[in-house]
From Swiss-Prot:
It comes from Bacillus pumilus (strain SAFR-032). This is UPF0342 protein BPUM_0928. Transmembrane segments: none annotated. It comes from the Bacteria. Coiled coil: none annotated. InterPro entries: Com_YlbF, YheA/YmcA-like_dom_sf. SUPFAM superfamilies: YheA/YmcA-like (SSF158622). Pfam families: Com_YlbF. Belongs to the UPF0342 family.
Length: 118
């Protein structure tokens, strides 16, 4: 019996969309975006985060000034209740996706072995 992995992947996508973790994330995201000041603060945080990640991935140096700005921004958003909750919800969804990825990669790990165990 042949399984269409794409159909299963779309079923997994639907399951993720209906999960408690995603539902919580979406609700918090909508709440943050409903308030203009919260939305601007969160967008600023995300812009800084993405910029630093891109620099890191391309091997560009991150300046001390950028590190300090990022630290100040993180401290600021952590004080904002809804944004802090949103970041926690993002982390929970990220953990869930990581766990799903482990399940998906299991056949290849069994075939080739797990490089983390060597």
């Amino acid at each position: 019996m042949s399984v269409n992995v794409y159909d299963v992947a779309y079923d997994l996508e639907k399951a993720l969309r209906h999960s408690e973790e995603y539902s919580t994330l979406k609700n918090l995201y909508d709440e943050v975006n409903a308030d203009e000041s919260s939305k601007r603060m969160f967008e600023n945080f995300r812009d800084i985060q993405v910029n630093l990640q891109q620099k890191q991935m391309t091997g560009q140096e991150i300046t001390q000034e950028e590190v300090e700005q990022a630290q100040k921004t993180v401290a600021l958003v952590q004080q904002h209740d809804k944004i802090s909750q949103l970041m926690e919800a993002e982390q929970r969804v990220s953990v869930l996706i990581g766990e799903l990825n482990k399940v998906i990669m299991k056949p290849l790990e069994e075939l080739y072995g797990n490089p983390e165990e060597n």
